[in-house]
Swiss-Prot record:
Any one GO BP annotation for this protein: [2Fe-2S] cluster assembly
An example Gene Ontology molecular-function term: ATPase activator activity
HAMAP family, alphabetized: HscB (MF_00682)
Keywords attached to this entry: Chaperone
GO cellular component terms, semicolon-separated: iron-sulfur cluster transfer complex
Superkingdom of this protein's organism: Bacteria
Family: Belongs to the HscB family.
Coiled coil, from the record: none
Organism the protein comes from: Burkholderia mallei (strain ATCC 23344)
Name recorded for this polypeptide: Co-chaperone protein HscB homolog
Gene from which the chain derives: hscB
Function: Co-chaperone involved in the maturation of iron-sulfur cluster-containing proteins. Seems to help targeting proteins to be folded toward HscA.
Domain J, first and last residues per copy: 7-79
Length: 175
């Protein structure tokens, strides 16, 4: 029997690894939700309703974490005792720092020129960058290179943040 303290992977009876089959995760989530959804306990006592609500909340949190590759990687590292350190560890390899500066300059230039096409192109480039970095992250996690994976997570967080900024710039320029 799974307890509230078990891992997200245990909750859905999935192996604790980065590569997940999304349809399998979705089916496991629906199976758990069908068992613990508060509507099933509408006629139950207050204690049972409260427990059902805890389980439903736990299932939702676990599902949201596992379906997002970046959150899943961070969670896997947490299970391994590795803190990604996104708040206080901003150390990045020099090549990535140079890439960051280039992206920032391109965003600034395109936004200054009100060039939505250039921003769209950069956003597409960052999507490709994200895909490649997720593949690298998976390989690092699979090989047990947890510190390398933690740095890859921090880099991906930056890529996602910049992508969101570009999306916001495009939105502003189009309206």
């Amino acid at each position: 029997m799974v307890s509230l303290k078990d891992s997200h992977f245990d909750l859905f009876h999935l192996p604790a690894r980065f590569a997940l089959d999304e349809p399998t995760l979705d089916a496991a989530y629906r199976a758990v939700q069908s068992q613990v959804h508060p509507d099933r306990f509408a006629a139950a006592g207050d204690a049972q309703k409260r427990i059902a609500m805890q389980w439903a909340t736990r299932a939702n949190e676990a599902y949201q974490t596992l379906r997002d590759p970046l959150k899943r990687a961070t969670y896997l590292l947490h299970l391994r005792g590795v803190d990604v350190g996104a708040e206080n560890n901003t150390a990045m390899e020099p090549a990535f720092l140079m890439q960051q500066m280039e992206w920032r300059e391109r965003i600034e230039d395109a936004a200054g020129a009100k060039n939505v096409d250039a921003l769209d192109a950069l956003l597409a480039e960052l999507r490709d960058e994200r895909r490649a970095r997720l593949a690298k992250l998976g390989a690092l996690l699979d090989s047990g290179s947890d510190q390398g994976a933690a740095e890859a997570v921090r880099q991906l967080m930056f890529v996602e943040r910049v992508s969101a900024e570009i999306g916001a710039q495009i939105e502003r320029l189009e309206h």
